[in-house]
C-alpha cells in the first residue's frame, strides 16, 4: 500500500536515546485515554482504528537498529484493538521484535492509546486519540450526525513526518554554558520491572483558573509551584541544601511553526532550594520568574540547537551505534542528576460541542523511573496523572491537601486497571520463584554432571560440554523472560561465540581438527 510516506526515516533528535534507556524499570511508554459515558464496543473500536490509521500511516512503523543510528521502517502491520489485560504503560518496544510502537486497548468505558515515546510526543498522541475517539463515536452513533474534526488541506505527508529539529537547527546559535546542580532525589524502596503506583486526581478548571488568575500566574506555573512544595515535605535530611527541580517539557511547535507528528519538544528545568522560612508565595514568585526567563524563543533555540549540535557532530555520526550507545546512556544518566521529578502539561483537548454528550473526561500518565505528573483538560475537568516508582503516595497526598487549602475542588479517581495491583504483583512473585527454581536446577545439573564425571574418570572432560549446555539453556530462558528478546537470535549469537571459542581452543592447545 502506497501511503505517500517514506519507507524509512531516522529518529528525531528527542527520540535518539529512548531505545537505549528503555528497560524493565522504565518503558518510556505513555498512556492517553478517553473515558466515555458508555461501554466501549470492541468491534466498533477496531473499525474506528482502521479508519484512523488511514489518516496516520506515519504510525505504522517498527523500530530498527542501523549501523550508526536507530531508524523507523514502514511496515504493513495491521494495528489490532485488544481488551486491556496488561498493567498501564507496559513495554511496547522489544529489541529484535518487529512490532508496532503503539497499542489501542479498551476496558469498560475507557479507550486507551499507549505509545512508545520514540514514535511521537504528547501533541502527536493527542491528535491521534482525538481522531480515534471521533471515528469511534461517529460509527457508534450514526444517527447523531456528529461533525468531523477539520484538518488543514495544505498539510502534506512530508509535513507530518518532518524532522523539525533539523529544520530549525542553526550552528550560529551560541552554546548554552549554564551548569546544572545535582537535585534532590526521592528515597524509598522502588517497585521493580514495569510496576508503578498510579494516582489520578480530577479538579475543576474554573477553580484552578480562578486561583491562578488571583496569583497573576498561568495554571502551569501554579501547578509547578504546588508540585515543588509537595515534594518539599519529603526531602531527605542529607539533601536539604539541594534544589528540588522539575523537568517541564515544552511543545516547540508553539515557538517554531511545525505540523510534524514526530517528537518536537524541548524542556526547561525549574527548581527551588527550600529553607525553614520558605513560603508558598516565595516559591510561586520564583517559579513565575524562571518561566519568564526560560520560555523565550532565543533561549529555547539555544537549548534546541545544543541537543542537535551533538547529533550533527561528524565524529559522533561516524562512531558505530554499538559504541555510541554507551555514551548516550551515560549522557542520559548524567542529565537526570539535575532532575527530581517531571511535570508535563498537555493542555486543552478540543472537540466539537456535540461530543460532550458522550465523553466524561480525558487523562494521561507516563512510565517513570522516579515521579511524574501529567495533566490535560477537557471541558471543565482537568485530570492530573501521578506515576511513581515509590509506592508511598505521600507527595500525591500533599498535593491534594494543597488543592483543598487553595479551595480548588477535586476528587481522586478510583480507576481499576486490569493486570495492575496486588494480584498482579503476586503473580510476578510466583513467576520469579519459577525462574529462581530453574536457575537452581541448571546449576545443580551442572554440579552433578561434574561430580559424576570426576568419580568415573578421575578428571573433568565431558563435564565442560554438559556445563556449557546448562549455561546456554539458562541464558536463553533469562533473555526470554527478562528482556523478551528474540530467542532465535540469542541462540545464533551463542552458536557463533561457542564456535569461535572452540576454534581458538583447538588452535592454541595443539589439538587439530576436532
Label the predicted regions.
Residues 1-68, 77-103, 233-424:
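Acyl-thioester-dependent acyl-group transfer interface
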Residues 504-514:
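Juxtamembrane boundary at the C-terminal end of a transmembrane helix
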Residues 496-503:
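Small-residue-rich segments of transmembrane alpha-helices in multi-pass membrane proteins
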Residues 488-496:
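Cytoplasmic-side transmembrane-helix entry/capping segments in multi-pass membrane proteins
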Residues 37-56, 114-130, 200-236, 384-386, ...:
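Acyl activation and transfer enzymes in specialized metabolism, enriched
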Residues 422-458:
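Membrane-associated alpha-helix detector
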Amino acid at each position: 500500500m502506497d501511503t505517500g510516506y517514506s519507507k524509512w526515516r531516522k529518529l528525531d533528535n528527542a527520540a535518539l536515546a529512548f531505545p537505549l534507556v528503555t528497560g524493565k524499570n522504565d518503558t518510556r511508554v505513555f498512556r492517553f485515554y478517553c473515558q466515555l459515558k458508555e461501554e466501549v464496543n470492541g468491534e466498533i473500536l477496531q473499525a474506528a482504528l482502521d479508519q484512523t490509521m488511514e489518516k496516520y500511516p506515519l504510525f505504522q512503523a517498527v523500530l530498527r537498529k542501523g549501523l550508526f543510528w536507530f531508524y523507523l521502517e514502514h511496515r504493513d502491520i495491521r494495528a489490532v484493538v485488544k481488551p486491556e489485560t496488561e498493567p498501564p504503560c507496559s513495554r511496547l518496544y522489544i529489541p529484535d521484535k518487529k512490532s508496532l510502537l503503539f497499542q489501542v486497548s479498551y476496558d469498560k468505558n475507557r479507550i486507551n492509546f499507549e505509545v512508545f515515546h520514540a514514535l511521537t510526543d504528547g501533541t502527536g498522541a493527542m491528535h491521534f486519540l482525538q481522531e480515534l475517539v471521533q471515528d469511534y463515536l461517529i460509527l457508534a452513533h450514526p444517527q447523531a450526525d456528529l461533525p468531523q474534526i477539520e484538518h488543514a488541506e495544505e498539510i502534506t505527508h512530508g509535513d507530518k513526518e518532518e524532522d523539525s529539529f533539523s529544520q530549525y537547527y542553526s550552528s550560529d546559535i551560541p552554546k548554552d554554558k549554564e551548569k546544572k546542580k545535582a537535585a534532590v532525589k526521592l528515597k524509598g524502596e522502588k517497585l521493580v520491572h514495569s510496576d508503578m503506583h498510579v494516582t489520578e486526581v480530577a479538579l475543576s478548571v474554573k477553580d484552578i483558573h480562578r486561583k491562578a488568575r488571583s496569583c497573576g500566574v498561568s495554571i502551569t506555573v501554579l501547578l509547578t509551584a504546588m508540585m515543588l512544595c509537595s515534594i518539599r515535605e519529603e526531602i531527605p535530611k542529607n539533601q536539604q541544601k539541594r534544589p528540588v527541580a522539575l523537568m517541564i517539557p515544552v511543545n516547540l511547535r508553539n515557538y517554531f511553526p511545525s505540523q510534524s507528528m514526530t517528537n518536537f519538544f524541548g524542556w526547561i528545568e525549574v527548581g527551588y532550594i527550600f529553607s525553614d522560612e520558605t513560603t508558598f508565595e516565595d516559591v510561586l514568585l520564583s517559579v513565575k520568574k524562571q518561566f519568564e526567563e526560560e520560555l523565550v524563543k532565543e533561549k529555547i533555540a539555544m537549548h534546541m540547537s545544543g541537543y542537535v549540535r551533538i547529533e550533527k557532530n561528524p565524529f559522533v555520526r561516524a562512531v558505530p551505534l554499538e559504541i555510541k550507545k554507551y555514551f548516550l546512556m551515560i549522557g542520559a544518566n548524567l542529565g537526570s542528576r539535575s532532575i527530581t521529578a517531571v511535570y508535563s502539561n498537555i493542555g486543552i483537548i478540543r472537540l466539537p460541542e456535540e461530543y460532550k454528550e458522550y465523553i466524561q473526561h480525558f487523562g494521561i500518565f507516563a512510565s517513570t523511573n522516579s515521579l511524574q505528573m501529567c495533566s490535560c483538560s477537557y471541558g471543565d475537568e482537568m485530570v492530573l496523572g501521578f506515576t511513581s516508582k515509590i509506592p508511598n503516595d505521600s507527595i500525591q497526598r500533599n498535593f491534594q491537601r494543597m488543592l483543598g487549602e487553595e479551595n480548588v475542588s477535586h476528587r481522586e479517581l478510583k480507576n481499576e486497571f486490569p493486570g495492575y495491583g496486588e494480584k498482579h504483583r503476586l503473580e510476578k512473585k510466583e513467576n520469579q520463584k519459577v525462574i529462581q527454581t530453574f536457575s537452581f536446577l541448571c546449576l545443580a545439573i551442572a554440579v552433578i554432571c561434574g561430580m559424576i564425571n570426576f568419580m568415573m574418570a578421575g578428571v573433568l572432560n565431558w563435564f565442560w560440554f554438559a556445563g556449557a549446555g546448562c549455561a546456554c539453556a539458562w541464558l536463553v530462558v533469562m533473555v526470554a523472560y527478562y528482556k523478551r528478546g528474540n530467542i532465535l537470535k540469542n541462540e545464533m549469537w551463542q552458536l557463533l561465540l561457542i564456535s569461535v571459542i572452540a576454534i581458538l581452543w583447538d588452535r592454541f592447545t595443539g589439538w587439530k581438527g576436532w
